[in-house]
């Protein structure tokens, strides 16, 4: 049985699509397309979304004014004022406070009498501490630099001559003990040495 062609018949005039003018306008106008057949955007949207030719970062801004540059802070602003006659500021002072003039008394030359120098040379030979004299102008509790040729803090060292003398005496005493024991007349010191060292070294026995 053939299908009726009712779906191809025109719509009656009382259909709701025919009643409204907006629906009739949409039905009559085809969609706007470009040459490729795709949907065309309205001109307002297309103008804003289309990229500009070239690098947009290198182009100067065409619309509006450039943002105002930040002003550098003037040096006169703030708490430090540089005027011709500035008021005395007790909190922030850039000038250093004057230091007490104490450096002059450290550089005053110290006069040392010749008698003291001769005594110091003799004391230095003996290994004794040297003598220093304080001038009466400088108080006793202040620091007083000493001249470079006087060394008052040298450590007490035994002179080389006395050290050699003690070494020679020690060697002589040992030789006397061994020679006395070899001749058969040991002294009291040799007896104690014999008890401490029953077997003396061979090189000392040959003496």
Swiss-Prot record:
Stretches the record annotates as Disordered: 1-154, 180-207
Transmembrane segments: none
SS bonds (residue pairs): none
Top-rank lineage group of the source organism: Eukaryota
Biased composition, class Basic and acidic residues, residue ranges: 14-24, 75-97
Biased composition (Polar residues): 98-121, 133-149
Family, as annotated: Belongs to the UPF0328 family.
Protein name per Swiss-Prot or TrEMBL: UPF0328 protein ECU02_1590/ECU04_0060/ECU08_2120
Organism of origin: Encephalitozoon cuniculi (strain GB-M1)
